[in-house]
Amino acid sequence: MTKTALVTGASRGIGLETVRRFIFNSEDITTVVMFARDSQDFRDAIEELKETIPLGRKIVPRFVDVGDREALAQAVTEVHAEVGRIHVVVNNAGYTNPVPLQQVDMEDFEKTIEVNLYGPFTVVQTLLNSGNVFELIVNIASTAGINGRSGWLTYSASKAAVINMSQVMREELAIYGTRVVCLSPGRTATALRRTLAPDEDPSTIMQPEHVAKVIETFASPVGRFIDSENIVVRQ
């Protein structure tokens, strides 16, 4: 049986590495839908994958801002009509702008919630309302959602909500045979991490491909034995 996966935030970092793991290593995922904002990084990633993709596999890239709920819902509906059932969703797209409590701007707070919380919710709800039955939903949270950190109020709050939302999704969707896994990576060398900790040496922390390997395991045959509300991975 061939399967289709959808990965948000697929232009770089954990998202792009997850796409690569699915396309090149998965036993049964043959189609990967890639959502990301229009950027040179995303265009370069698309070209690289098209040049190296194995026979019988394909990518379906879409330029979409996960923080724009209306555009996101439309993109999800259109791609579902095009590719059919989406078996695996990896809600990876994220945003942060770390500032002290006194300097938090409400517009920026709302943007953080839009991308980090409403984005995953919109993807899942839109597909459910289109009749899609998932095998696996992976919501990427963060250890910052477990233990809030100074200066990371908006990001930590949004990721804490993702952890809780994942618990509810897990309970509600179990009747359909859907597994919902929330993954909370620790320090990972991504663009978002550089925003949170600009002075940190990225070579000393976990790499995106390490997290992607964990996600690949969730989607593999052995992954059906993994059913947890929140899994922490850290180096």
Language model features: what each stretch is:
Residues 124, 158:
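Active-site helix of classical SDR
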Residues 27-44:
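Conserved glycine-rich Rossmann-like NAD(P)H-binding loop of the short-chain dehydrogenase/reductase
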Residues 129, 170-172:
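Alpha-helical segment proximal to the catalytic Tyr-Lys
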Residues 100-101, 108-110:
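Substrate-binding pocket helix/loop in short-chain dehydrogenase/reductase
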Residues 175, 182-183, 190, 200-235:
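C-terminal helical subdomain
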Residues 11-12:
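Conserved glycine-rich cofactor-binding loop
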Residues 142:
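Residue(s) in the substrate-gating loop at a strand-loop-helix junction
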